[in-house]
Amino acid sequence: MRVTDFSFELPESLIAHYPMPERSSCRLLSLDGPTGALTHGTFTDLLDKLNPGDLLVFNNTRVIPARLFGRKASGGKIEVLVERMLDDKRILAHIRASKAPKPGAELLLGDDESINATMTARHGALFEVEFNDERSVLDILNSIGHMPLPPYIDRPDEDADRELYQTVYSEKPGAVAAPTAGLHFDEPLLEKLRAKGVEMAFVTLHVGAGTFQPVRVDTIEDHIMHSEYAEVPQDVVDAVLAAKARGNRVIAVGTTSVRSLESAAQAAKNDLIEPFFDDTQIFIYPGFQYKVVDALVTNFHLPESTLIMLVSAFAGYQHTMNAYKAAVEEKYRFFSYGDAMFITYNPQAINERVGE
């Protein structure tokens, strides 16, 4: 399969730079996986699409202010993007500089350069940085960090992004990008879903900066996925198995929830799904056999991204590309702050040939 098979024309004007005034007021394009039928509506229509006993699985990661600015003590400006927090004093990060710092280099971080840190080691493209400060990494980031808005949101981060670029149920700090499908859920909608009898469970996947990296190979089978840490605890496993047993659906909110659940299913030895606490490099593209997820809530993704490949594996390639074409024609808003899709699984997707 070629990466270019997943390309589509997207006018710049359809990229959302700000969220809707109300989280749940965005548009919703529903795609029936088996038939490819499309329905246009608003996000609150989700309430009518879910049945009592269906299980919604959310990702409760919380975005950290992961972008830092400063300079090397020896001179030269730097930009640091945290990939993950290693412990209370150390981070693994991408560093942008005219000349990469060497191990032992002193860094002065923050708009006032008040935070002292040392680049201690290099791991491939990533740099290990240790803060010389009595505060924890998280406290330092909250103090001097900027929200790491995606590269296609072409504006500086604003104070409002600290809440708008978080889900209302975010709990565990560690992501450098929001699980954006969850941004559309507000408390009134969650309350209505609970009142209807829709069950809810929470996985954790700390989204890494790699989620924005373009696929740099021509053939997608050659692509190596970035690694992200995921947690699928026992209570989620129990909820999934119970939903399946009573004939209800497991609905993943976002591709990160999909990747968490399907990683746990891949690693399971004795059951459909078992608890999972580990890094995952799962790469889902057409031909992938889904084991857990029956329906998906997701945003519109970048052309040629691993995420549109994941959706194509779920709904079928042709159905997915047709839906994206319709979304462009109907002027849906794209990417992190954009509109959403509700997609049901297409069991025939696994047999579909792509790009032939």
UniProtKB/Swiss-Prot annotation:
One of its GO terms (cellular component) is cytosol. Inhibited by S-adenosylhomocysteine, adenosylornithine and products. Pfam families: Queuosine_synth. The keyword Metal-binding does not apply. It comes from the Bacteria. It is an enzyme of class 2 (transferase). InterPro entries: QueA, QueA_dom1, QueA_dom2, QueA_sf. It catalyses: 7-aminomethyl-7-carbaguanosine(34) in tRNA + S-adenosyl-L-methionine = epoxyqueuosine(34) in tRNA + adenine + L-methionine + 2 H(+). GO terms for biological process: queuosine biosynthetic process; response to radiation; tRNA wobble guanine modification. Transmembrane segments: none annotated. It is found in: Cytoplasm. GO terms for molecular function: S-adenosylmethionine:tRNA ribosyltransferase-isomerase activity. Pathway: tRNA modification; tRNA-queuosine biosynthesis. Gene3D superfamilies: QueA-like. Keywords: Cytoplasm, Queuosine biosynthesis, S-adenosyl-L-methionine, Transferase. Its main location: cytoplasm. This reaction follows a completely ordered sequential bi-ter kinetic mechanism, with binding of preQ1-tRNATyr followed by AdoMet to form the ternary complex. Products are then released in the following order: adenine, methionine, and oQ-tRNATyr. Belongs to the QueA family. Monomer. Transfers and isomerizes the ribose moiety from AdoMet to the 7-aminomethyl group of 7-deazaguanine (preQ1-tRNA) to give epoxyqueuosine (oQ-tRNA). This is S-adenosylmethionine:tRNA ribosyltransferase-isomerase. It comes from Escherichia coli (strain K12). The gene is queA.
